[in-house]
Structure formats: C-alpha cells, structure tokens
C-alpha cells in the first residue's frame, strides 16, 4: 500500500528546488514530529482564519493521507502483521513486531480496510477543495514520522520505511538527505487519483464475500487468526458471492481482479 508514498515522492523529484529556503509550511512541523492529529487541528484553524489559503489546505490533505497510512499501520501492528510474508495489497506495510497481538478475523480486517478507505476519502475531499492553480507545498519528506505501534516508541521515518520496502537506500539520498520536494497543482490531482484508486481497491475486496478460506490465505501473515466457523471454502470463481453488487460493482469495475492478481501496492 505504501507505493503511493514512494511514487508521490520519487515522481516529484523533477520539480525544481530553489536555492533559498522559504519558510517551512505549517504542515511540515507536524509531519516531522508525528503529531498528525494536532496538525489537522492547526491546519483547520488556519483555514478558518483564511479560507483561501490553499497551501494550508494542501498540507492538511497530505497530513490526512499520511495519517491514513499510520492508522492502517497501527491496525496491522495490533494484529501482529508480518509484512515480509505478505503479497496482498495493504498487508505489506512494514510495522514493528507486536509480541502480544490480537486475533484477526475476516470481519475485523474488513473493518480495518473500511476505516482506511474512509480516511482516504477525507484526504481526497480536502484536496478537492484546492482552487489555486499555482499552489505550492515545499516539504522535507525524509523526517515524516510514523508511530505504527501507537505507543510513541519504535517510531519510523519515511526514509526508514522506504529503505525497508526498497531493500536498501536510494541513490538520491546522498545528494538530498532531507528529501526536499516542491509539490504543485499537478501533485494535488495525482494524490487525489491515488486516494480514489486505493479506495476502489478496498471496495473491490469488500464487494466479494471471501470469508471462507480466510484463515488459509493469511496464515503466516497474522499469528492469531479466528477462522470462519461452518464456512467451507469454494475455490470456484463462479461460486464467489457478490455482496451488494448493484451498489458496488458499477463503481469499482474490475478492481477486484487487480486484487486477485495481488498487485503490490
């Protein structure tokens, strides 16, 4: 799931970096100290004072997107996810080891994914409110800090996260250790599109009843699993039960098949 962060950052490296450092945007301090909830509050207050401040609105959208990732990571931590054993979307997010995990169930994972989609919708709605075509947001991404354990310990910076996912450091880290990126209006549209894509992937998964066989599919990823009592697994695709097909399938199209192919997002 973390691939959007990688692509958002790497694809934006082509944006020019200015020699003189302008004042840091409001959002950056909260992204660096990991106090995303406080950052949302501060950004909303700034927008109350100046509703046309699209830099603050852009920063709020980024905070909300990053917070969505952190909330997903905290849920994965709660259930003791071993991300290196996962190939499925959303389960590959590296989180600290939890020695006392809760038991995961099909319904519990569904609630986690629904919450993630709701968080993404909030971020997308914020970004949709940006009207200034010349909006800029200059951020040093390296020190964006996640608290996946929810304890204040074992904090993970974005660079540490990217290094784990990449299997090593990126070449640009030597020349740009702060990972300075200047986002513009095109990145607003880009991030909105990714929020839509990830939400659609969640909807695609939730549109199909896959409770039977859930325990087999996540064994090795979660240490404690509650099986689906009384549900036999049907491996025949024609036996899949579509949930609320009239409402969901026209929206998500073929996104379930992307999930079935285990796209590494």
What are the residue ranges of the model-derived segments?
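Boundary at the C-terminal end of the N-terminal hydrophobic targeting segment
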Residues: 17-19
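Sec-dependent N-terminal signal peptides
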Residues: 4-13
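Short coil/linker segments at helix-helix boundaries
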Residues: 23-25, 31-41, 65-265
